[in-house]
Amino acid sequence: MASLLKENDDTVRWGIIGAGAVCEVKSGPAFYKCDKSKLIAICRRSEQEGKDFCARHNVPKYYSNVDDILNDNEINAIYISTPPSTHHEIAMKCLAKNLPTYVEKPLGRNYTETLDIVNKFKQKKLPLFVAYYRRSQSKFLHAKKLIE
């Protein structure tokens, strides 16, 4: 990832695609609260809800179109928080723009989509992450322990 950042700038400048309920209460605030992480823009179909999100979270830019946020040169990483049926298409657009991508679970709708995303990001040596945050929650750790 370091090679994808601008020289003398180790800040990840995020664009969020799909700033809805999942983003609002789970992952979203971390993108601007963590050190060396800055939330530059969000993309949401509803202009009113998108601009409201920006105002409440002090996000400088709003887009209603995926292609527009991906063309923002200030952004150097993308978080996809849209319905799973859109993950593959949006991930491929991020890949085409050489943007490291963090995708809300599940990565794809099925094995074929998931494998396609993983393999194409690997081929380009581009960082790809999936938001499997629940695996660190106590009830899931307990279930894992029981299974093992």
Where are these regions (language model features)?
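N-terminal Rossmann-like dinucleotide-binding module
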Residues: M1-H57
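Hydrophobic residues in well-ordered beta-strands that form the structural core
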Residues: C23, Y63, V103, L128-V130
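A general structural signal for well-ordered alpha-helical segments in protein cores
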Residues: G28, G50, H87, A91, ...
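Alpha-helical structural signal in soluble globular domains
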Residues: A30-C34, F53-H57, M92-K97, D116-K120, ...
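Short, well-ordered coil/turn segments that N-cap beta-strands
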Residues: S37, N76, L99, L126-P127
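Beta-loop-alpha module in the N-terminal Rossmann-like domain of NAD(P)-dependent dehydrogenases
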Residues: P60-K120
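A contiguous active-site-proximal alpha/beta segment in oxidoreductase catalytic domains
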Residues: G108-E148
